[in-house]
From Swiss-Prot:
Residues the record lists as binding Fe cation: H160, D162, H292
Molecular function via GO: ferrous iron binding; glutarate dioxygenase activity; oxidoreductase activity, acting on paired donors, with incorporation or reduction of molecular oxygen, with 2-oxoglutarate as one donor, and the other dehydrogenated
Record-listed E.C. numbers: 1.14.11.64
Protein name, per record: Glutarate 2-hydroxylase
GO biological process: L-lysine catabolic process
Species assigned in the record: Klebsiella pneumoniae (strain 342)
Obligatory cofactor(s): Fe(2+)
Length: 325
């Protein structure tokens, strides 16, 4: 997929109502569901959690679960089971989530609270060494001199999984749009592992199971290398992946050329989804069988995008990596 390309949308299906929210397959793919909290639910949630600033959620980790309970109660306790079912379902495993009425950078704290509540209904977000918190906020601008592609606006950030260079289990990734100014392009890119045309070819290769070294640049604040293969299997023997092209360190010619072929095969897939994510919305995906990236932006001197991410483990699943826990 080339820069600024988008999957042609199909007519949006009717949303299925639940207490406090609705859900429907997205226009881009039936694997990606769109979940929308009603304005009433969003308002009531923010009122009930107003007593806790985000700093309280940072300092007292149990409050992250409490705000999740408040949100689930407002949704008739039907939200949590639906989130768990969707995220663990191999046929789906991805959500685009929106709280009606949260759509401006002035509501950044409210955005963090809502995303935190959702994430802690399915598990717990890991410590993010880059920010020193359970979440990270970062800004993309027109000019960037950082040491990874995370903030570089004028190139595609290739498809990858999160958590490749840390020891913590990374089952889910949450990516929220907090602000956007003078932006064109930069859609989120998603690829479901089972839709990748070359999965069988690379999964069956002997190098797929060879432990490789993964090392992060200084900005990630992680100094210890980790070792694991690119592919593994879940508890049912299905392929799962832990891969990012920037941080894998091949030890020899064989590994290096194999990784180069794998990267090309991912980036040229015809099944990559291009997903616009408006301010206030967030993607929540199963990191074991979804890869994600970002298309490039059109240059603008005042370009600005602020994102928030959380990544963590499922508390209700044993479908982790089986051979390299």
């Amino acid at each position: 997929m080339n820069a600024l390309t988008a999957v042609k949308p199909t007519p949006a299906p009717l949303a299925q109502p639940y207490p406090g929210f609705s859900i429907a397959p997205s226009a881009q793919s039936p694997r990606l569901l769109e979940l929308t909290f009603s304005a009433e639910t969003t308002t009531q949630f923010l009122q009930q959690v107003a007593q806790w600033p985000v700093q309280a959620l940072e300092y007292k980790s149990f409050l992250r679960f409490q705000v999740g309970k408040i949100l689930d109660d407002l949704c008739g306790n039907q939200l949590q089971p639906l989130l768990i079912k969707t995220l663990l379902d191999r046929a789906e495993g991805a959500l685009l989530i929106n709280g009606e009425g949260i759509d401006n950078v002035s509501q950044a704290e409210e955005m963090v609270k809502l995303a935190t509540a959702v994430a802690h209904l399915i598990g717990r977000s890991n410590f993010d060494a880059m920010s020193g918190q359970y979440y990270a906020r970062f800004v993309v601008k027109n000019v960037d001199n950082s040491d990874s592609y995370l903030r570089q606006p004028h190139r595609v950030m290739e498809l990858h999984n999160d958590g490749t260079y840390v020891e913590e289990q990374t089952d889910y990734v949450l990516m929220m749009k907090i602000d956007e100014q003078n932006m064109q392009g930069g859609n989120s890119l998603l690829l479901h592992l089972d839709d990748w045309e070359h999965l069988d070819e690379f999964f069956r290769d002997p190098l797929a199971r060879r432990p490789m070294r993964w090392a992060a640049p200084p900005s990630k604040n992680v100094s210890k290398d980790v070792f694991h293969p690119v592919f593994d299997v879940d508890s049912l023997g299905r392929p799962v992946m832990r891969y990012i092209d920037q941080f894998v360190q091949p030890k020899d010619f064989e590994e290096g050329t194999w990784l180069s072929r794998l990267s090309d095969a991912l980036e040229t897939s015809k099944n990559i989804l291009s997903i616009p994510v408006p301010v206030g919305k967030f993607l929540l995906i199963n990191n074991l069988f979804w890869l994600h990236g970002r298309d490039r932006f059109t240059p603008h001197p005042d370009l600005r995008r602020e994102l928030m991410r959380q990544r963590g483990y499922f508390a209700y699943s044993t479908n982790h990596y089986q051979t390299h826990q």
